[in-house]
Swiss-Prot record:
A cellular-component GO term for this protein: plasma membrane
Organism field: Lactiplantibacillus plantarum (strain ATCC BAA-793 / NCIMB 8826 / WCFS1) (Lactobacillus plantarum)
Pfam families, per database record: ECF-ribofla_trS
Keyword flag Transmembrane helix: yes
Family: Belongs to the UPF0397 family.
InterPro entries linked to this entry: ECF_substrate-spec-like, UPF0397
Top-level division of the source organism's lineage: Bacteria
Classification of source organism: Bacteria, Bacillati, Bacillota, Bacilli, Lactobacillales
Protein known as: UPF0397 protein lp_0150
Alphabetic keyword roster: Cell membrane, Membrane, Transmembrane, Transmembrane helix
Membrane topology qualifier: Multi-pass membrane protein
Transmembrane segments: 12-32, 45-65, 76-96, 112-132, 151-171
Compartment(s): Cell membrane
Length: 186
């Protein structure tokens, strides 16, 4: 019971702090791409780390809340199709936690290659398939506009995660003690 309660507290705290960090990164550290309403999102690199440490619930909720707050502050109201897709991408990144196991302090090349292939596929599904289709169905946006935005966002977010996310994952894994690496002194 104690472990389950401490895990839920940890998840709530990670969600709150993660949402705040994602909001700040989306609001102040995004790099415009030249295509309207798209940017290179540094927050996605952080999201990869958040998901790998805290799992799907914390990552999904943190990016959902952070993105919704950013849209509300920036545009006056959230663009729900993209906010929801970001939340789903956060969940997907969190599902990689058990495969990456960065808490063990070992994050080899094979795991990094797997994760980057995985995140490119996840970003493709989210930004090229789901978000633009949602924009067309819900907001009646022109298909050529939203699919262009989706493709640009897929490329930008995939690059952000591949560079920033990979660096953060490697640096974090290096701070963890490898299992079985400590020996008792006599």
């Amino acid at each position: 019971m104690q472990n389950k309660q401490s895990n839920s507290i940890r998840t709530v705290v990670a969600t709150g702090i993660g949402a705040a960090v994602i909001f700040v990164l989306m609001k102040f550290v995004a790099i415009p791409t030249g295509v309207p309403n798209t940017q290179v999102n540094v927050a996605m690199g952080f999201l990869a780390l958040l998901g790998a440490i805290f799992g799907p619930v914390a990552a999904g909720l943190a990016v959902f809340i952070g993105h919704a707050l950013n849209d509300f502050v920036t545009y006056g109201s959230p663009w729900w199709t993209w906010v929801i897709v970001d939340g789903l991408i956060g969940v997907a990144f969190g599902l990689a936690k058990n495969r990456l196991k960065i808490e063990n302090g070992v994050l080899g090349t094979a795991k990094l290659v797997w994760f980057n292939i995985y995140q490119i596929i996840v970003n493709f599904i989210g930004w090229v398939l789901l978000a633009p289709t949602g924009d067309i169905i819900i907001y009646h946006e022109p298909a050529n506009k939203v699919y262009l935005q989706g493709v640009i966002t897929w490329i930008a977010d995939s690059i952000s995660v591949a560079i920033i996310g990979t660096i953060l994952l490697v640096l974090y894994a290096r701070t963890r003690t490898q299992r079985g690496s400590l020996t008792k002194e006599r």
